[in-house]
Amino acid sequence: MQSYEPLLRAFSENHINYLIVGGVAVNLHGYPRFTNDLDILLTLDQENLKKMAELMDRMGYQQRLPVSIQELSDEQKARGFIEEKGLTAYSFIHDKYPQFNVDVLVAQSIDFEKFSKHTMRAEVWNIDVPVVSIDDLIAMKKNSDREKDIQDIVALLELKGL
């Protein structure tokens, strides 16, 4: 695996309901920068999470946490993981390709419907992929105080002409 291409193709072929966010979304909006993972939002219904878990397993990814991703389909449980355990992302790691980790942002996934209303579509490797809107991406990054997120906000605002 040389890129996220096989993963994005598999998401499409398996009808995973997701949105690309984070650094990859920044790139897809037109600001090239390095990122070492793929951040996504998922609909947290049981069927989508089951498909995701099975797909990631088939592709050689392991769940990083001692709980199944399917447990996030219970919104009360998901909020408990966030508030009591400090869970921000549910991570999948690949032993052979550690540079291609996948993080499911949990709190934002709870609000998937809100973010999906403004989705943009991008073509990557001849795959139609859903990407969070530039405005929603800026709003997500405003909740972080990491230097790279601040730089992303500046770059995204410049892309918008602001």
Model-derived segments and spans:
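Compositionally biased terminal segments of proteins
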Residues: 1-162
